[in-house]
Amino acid sequence: MGEEGRSNARPVGVIALVLLFAIGTCASFISAVSLTFPGSFLEPIWNLNPNARTGFTRIGSAAIVLMIAVCIACIFTTIGLWLGRRWGYWLAVVMLVVNLCGDVVNVISGIEPRAIIGIPIVGVILAYLLRKRTRYHFNNSAI
């Protein structure tokens, strides 16, 4: 394989991020459907994070709109990352920074102390995305 083939190869870390955002797409879609139809067969998913259910219930129908927006953003991020597009890269960075801010607020405010687990994870993912080699993939990808 020549040098040209290597530069266009999709890095394993990018594939992992594509899977992460695809899972985010599914999770946000299921959340939106569950919030739209409370008490449905999807209700047990909230046992994973009852605090989220309580918070979403407090904000009412805006939670459904929020989850649909997250779902759409995850779809576009997944596609953009898979195709190696700069806009996909920047969507991923923005979504992860927003997630990081949310985790920090949740931990500091005491709303969701378990969010502390997400802080270093998002930090590592952002560090990966900000690496020169990763940025190069999105600046020069022909995929």
For each predicted feature, which ranges?
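Topology signature of small-to-medium multi-pass alpha-helical membrane proteins
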Residues: 1-143
